[in-house]
Every structure is written in C-alpha cells, then in structure tokens.
C-alpha cells in the first residue's frame, strides 16, 4: 500500500466537544468523521483498524464452534411485543413505520430475531446445541450521544445467540464463549478483566462483562488481590463483616443543629465516620421502607432493587417522610418511628454496636444506639451497598477499585425469549420443550476507542500491534527528487509484503518532521526510513513507536527486529 494512493487526512485541530482522548485522536488521525449526532463515517484508515478487530473476533467465534448468520437490522413490532421489549426498551429503541403503516424497529440487539430464526429452523433436540452469531450494525437512540464512537447511536457489534435443551448445556456454552472472549481480548493485546455483572435490560441469570482497563472508563470495577475474583461495582460484594460486638455505651440524645450529613455529625462528635449510620427513606407498593447503610458507604441501587419487595422502590418525598418518621431529611433514623416501618439494614450496619443515627427530630441525633436494646433487630439484612477500596474480599484478599470500559458481555438467558416466541423442540420423549438461550455480545467499534483510551501518549495513538492499520510504514525522504531512494523504498516494501508483514509506504513527499509526526499520531508500531545517506551506508533508520530513539540497521537486522 502506497500512501500517495491512500486517503490519509490528519489534522492538528480537534473540535471542542471531543472530550475523550480516543475521540480527539480518532478525529485528528482521520479515522472517523461526524455525519450527525452519534453517527460517524469510518475512513479507509479507520476501517482498516475496524476490520482487524472484526477478523480476530470472527476467527475466534468460528474456532469456538459458532456459525455466522445475518439477521435484518429492521425487525417487526410483533416480535418485540411478544417479549415485552417494545415498550420496556424505552426511548433508545428507534421505531419506524413503512408505507403500509406497519411498525418496525431498528434493532439495538437481536434476541427476538434469533429466537424466531431458531423457532423456524430447529425442531429436534438432536440439532442442539447451536450457536449463531452475526457482525452487524446496531442502533440505539441515545439521549446524549457523546465520546465519539464510544457512545455513538450507530455502532458495529458482534452478537451471538446459542440454543440448548438443558440448563447444563447452556452453562457449558457460556463457559465456551467466555473462553473465546478471553482469547479475543488477549489476541487484541488489551489489558482487560472479566467481571461479574448485572444482566440489565437483557435479563437472564449468570452474566459477565469484559472491560478494557482505562482511567476514563465509565464503569467502576472491583477485583481481589487474593484471587481472580472481579466484578462490576454494581454487583461486587465484600466479605461478611465480623460478628457484632457487645454494647458498650448508653443511648444519648445530642444536639446537631446544623449537622445534616454523616460527615458533619462525625466531625462534631469527634467520631470515625464508620460509627455513623445513614438512613434513606424509600417507598414501594407495599409501603414505607427505611434503608440503613454505614455513614462511609453508599447504597447500591441495583442490589437494593433485588431485595424482596423492593423492585419498584423510589425515594420517599418529604410528606411521606413526615407521615412515617415525623422528621425531615438529615435527621432520620430507625429508632421509634411514628408508624411501624420496614427496616432494611446493610450487613455492615446489622453488625454494628454503639452507632449514631438521626433521632427523627430536627437538630438531634442519637449516639450509643444498639440493636435489640434501643430498637428491634432489622426485619431484613442484606448486602445493599457499594464496595469500597480496601474492603476485605471473601477469598481473603483485599478489594481494589479500578475503572473500565465495557466491550463485551455474556449472558445465560434461560427460556425468557424462547418461551415468549414459542421456540420449542421435541425432546428425547417426543414432548415439546422450550429451548434455553445464551447471548454473547462484543462492541467491535467500541473496542477501537477503548484500545486508544488504554494505549496513547502525548504524540498520539500507541496501537497494540494486532490492531494497528499497518505493522510497518516505510518512510521515504524526497521520493520525487531522488529516484534511487524511491526505488529502494519500493523494493523494501515489496520484500516486507512478501515476508507476510503488513506494510505501507509513505511516499507522499512530506517533510520528514511532518511525516514522522503522522506516523506517531497514527500509532504505527514500526517506522523505517529510507534515505540517501542510509543507502550509502547500507542501512535503514528504524524506530519502534514506543522507543525513545532510532537506530540504524542493515536489512537482516531490520527483518530480525520485525520478528522475521
């Protein structure tokens, strides 16, 4: 590939709304160009990177035994009504009508189409298991598309759907896909973690996310120093707290006239924040609930929603708080409410003694509070908090927090979609059985941005070698003025290609400084310079993208550096 014949358009300036490094560098490198909000054209350069990611994903999916299909991007409302997702998916689902006023959606995911295809094609348990995958454009009508292709409305995704007769077989394929994903991200050269996760709108039981580790990641992850345990903070749990100590203080009322937060109360009383308890008032269809977490902890909304009877909870308003507690936010507590209420205590709160809570009186808190003496034991004890850095892990290690960008997700869906769409097969006894489903997604276009977030420096992108648009670019100095140098550079390019090395020739005739800056911006792993001086000495100037300086190598030394 000669860059004089390739559309390469780099820039020094980037739009002010490009917040993430990946967005800025992809625009500067000319990988993408904005068409409309959340919609991007991939340039020839960007497409080379995208196709390299796609190729590795396809190879590993085929290796894992999945078979490729292609579902329509436009799907009829009836399928989505059957699963209940036409309304449940919300505003992100782009709904359209054809000339006959029939309703369709531009799919953000394809569980419905996959289940319908399986219903049409699979009729016997002997055909199972089967795993269909596609690499297809998806669309989600984000309220605020941002961060370039990281959160675009249109994106390229690999989504796979497996079908099984039994839960055990579904679990085996889940493990098979998990192993395939580990191979994919390892081959791409990314630092990543597989973490336990919530199933979200997709639903199902077992669920794991794959995150590229990056400081700019939107997701907070917890991992243990004692094992390979890792989880999204949404689902991560710390070890069980130590048993509750005996009471050592008497109950006392203390004035806290302006102290409404646990931090302010702890400072006033000269106590550790861990001695205070935060009271969060919520309402459910069953009534008023007071949720208690330690003062230095935060409620985990996803965990709380999974507690029995809490799926539909919302924050209580001031009128509801006064009705049940006779007080106002900042001074709430579980001791002697106006009316009987349900109390949900986080596990750490349930094992506390001599703690501090609001007194349900404005400007007053209680100290020396103890379970069983000053208030009944909590009706419900559950893990309803976010873990924090340094928490004890259940494996004996410590939990550490980092940030990540989700690029893959695997689910065990069970029979949810197959049952809704009546996707059944005849089992060994000739009876109809609803198939079990697994679902496995990878955001291919998102991987490109995530890789840049993880791998860049002040000069530009630093691609992992498998993702780079070219492994090597041969830079020729003054190609139009020096035919001998141009010919030598062309010969070297042909030799590199013949050796199986993905290479390009920069024969655009730019000044050396501008040419080298482009190669650094583009993240080319290896740069080779052909010049008149080098030819006279029988050497080429070689520099790796991450090296501090260049070195002169003969041809044998050059090919050795390139791994050949």
Curated annotation (Swiss-Prot):
Q: Which BP terms does GO give this entry?
A: prolyl-tRNA aminoacylation
Secretion signal, residue range per the UniProt entry: none
A GO molecular function assigned to this protein is: proline-tRNA ligase activity
Enzyme Commission (EC) number: 6.1.1.15
Which compartments is it annotated to reside in? Answer: Cytoplasm
> Pfam families given for it?
HGTP_anticodon (PF03129), tRNA-synt_2b (PF00587), tRNA_edit (PF04073)
The question of whether Nucleotide-binding is a record keyword is answered with: yes
Q: Which UniProt keywords apply?
A: Aminoacyl-tRNA synthetase, ATP-binding, Cytoplasm, Ligase, Nucleotide-binding, Protein biosynthesis
Q: What does UniProt give as GO cellular component? A: cytosol
Q: What is its EC class?
A: ligase
Source organism, top-level taxon: Bacteria
Reactions catalysed according to its record:
tRNA(Pro) + L-proline + ATP = L-prolyl-tRNA(Pro) + AMP + diphosphate
**Domain remarks:** Consists of three domains: the N-terminal catalytic domain, the editing domain and the C-terminal anticodon-binding domain.
Q: What does this protein do?
A: Catalyzes the attachment of proline to tRNA(Pro) in a two-step reaction: proline is first activated by ATP to form Pro-AMP and then transferred to the acceptor end of tRNA(Pro). As ProRS can inadvertently accommodate and process non-cognate amino acids such as alanine and cysteine, to avoid such errors it has two additional distinct editing activities against alanine. One activity is designated as 'pretransfer' editing and involves the tRNA(Pro)-independent hydrolysis of activated Ala-AMP.
Q: Assembly and interactions? A: Homodimer.
HAMAP family given for it? Pro_tRNA_synth_type1
- Protein family: Belongs to the class-II aminoacyl-tRNA synthetase family. ProS type 1 subfamily.
Question: What is the official name of this protein in its record?
Answer: Proline--tRNA ligase
Which organism encodes this protein? Answer: Xanthomonas campestris pv. campestris (strain B100)
């Amino acid at each position: 590939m000669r860059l004089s014949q390739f559309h390469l358009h780099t820039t020094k300036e980037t739009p002010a709304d490009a917040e993430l490094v990946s967005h800025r560098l992809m625009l500067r490198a000319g990988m993408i160009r904005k068409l409309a909000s959340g919609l991007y054209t991939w340039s020839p350069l960007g497409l080379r990177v995208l196709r390299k990611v796609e190729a590795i994903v396809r190879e590993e999916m085929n290796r894992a035994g999945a078979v490729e299909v292609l579902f329509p991007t436009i799907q009829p409302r009836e399928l989505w009504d059957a699963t209940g997702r036409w309304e449940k998916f919300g505003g992100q689902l782009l709904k359209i009508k054809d000339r006959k006023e029939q309703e369709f959606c531009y799919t953000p995911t394809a569980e419905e189409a996959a289940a319908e295809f399986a219903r049409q094609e699979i009729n016997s348990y002997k055909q199972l298991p089967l795993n269909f995958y596609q690499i297809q454009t998806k669309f989600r009508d984000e309220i605020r598309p941002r961060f370039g292709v990281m959160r675009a409305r249109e994106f390229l995704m690999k989504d796979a759907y497996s079908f099984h007769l039994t839960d055990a077989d579904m679990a085996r394929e889940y493990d098979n896909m998990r192993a395939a994903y580990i191979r994919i991200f390892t081959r791409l050269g990314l630092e990543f973690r597989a973490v336990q996760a919530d199933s979200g709108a997709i639903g199902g039981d077992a669920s794991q996310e794959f995150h590229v580790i990056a400081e700019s990641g939107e997701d907070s992850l917890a991992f243990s120093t004692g094992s390979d345990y890792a989880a999204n903070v949404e689902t991560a749990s710390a070890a069980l707290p130590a048993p509750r100590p005996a009471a050592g203080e008497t109950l006392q009322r203390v004035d806290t006239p302006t102290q409404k937060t646990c931090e302010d109360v702890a400072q006033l009383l000269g106590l550790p924040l861990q001695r205070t308890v935060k009271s969060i008032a919520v309402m459910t269809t069953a009534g008023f609930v007071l949720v208690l977490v330690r003062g230095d902890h935060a409620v985990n909304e996803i965990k709380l929603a999974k507690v029995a009877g809490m799926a539909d909870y919302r924050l209580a308003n001031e009128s509801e708080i006064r009705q049940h507690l006779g007080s106002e936010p900042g001074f709430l507590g579980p001791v002697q409410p106006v009316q009987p209420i349900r109390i949900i205590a986080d596990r750490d709160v349930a094992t506390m003694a001599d703690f501090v809570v609001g007194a349900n009186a404005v400007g007053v808190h209680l100290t020396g509070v103890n379970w069983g003496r000053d208030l009944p034991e909590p009706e419900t004890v559950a893990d309803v908090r976010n873990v924090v850095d340094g928490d004890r892990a259940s494996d004996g290690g410590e939990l550490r927090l980092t940030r990540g960008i989700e690029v893959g997700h695997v689910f065990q869906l069970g029979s949810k979609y197959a049952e809704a769409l009546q996707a059944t097969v005849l089992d060994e006894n000739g009876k109809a059985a609803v198939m079990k489903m697994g679902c496995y997604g990878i955001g291919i276009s998102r991987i490109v941005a995530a890789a840049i977030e993880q791998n860049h420096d002040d000069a530009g992108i630093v691609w992992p070698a498998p993702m780079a648009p070219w492994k090597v670019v041969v830079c020729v100095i003054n190609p139009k003025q020096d035919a001998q140098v141009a010919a030598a550079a062309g010969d070297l390019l042909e030799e590199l290609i013949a050796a199986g090395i993905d290479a390009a020739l920069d024969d655009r005739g730019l000044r050396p400084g501008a040419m080298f800056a482009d190669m650094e911006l583009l993240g080319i792993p290896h740069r080779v310079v052909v010049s008149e001086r080098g030819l006279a000495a029988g050497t080429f100037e070689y520099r790796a993208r991450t090296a501090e300086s260049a070195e002169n190598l003969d041809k044998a030394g050059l090919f050795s550096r390139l791994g050949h």
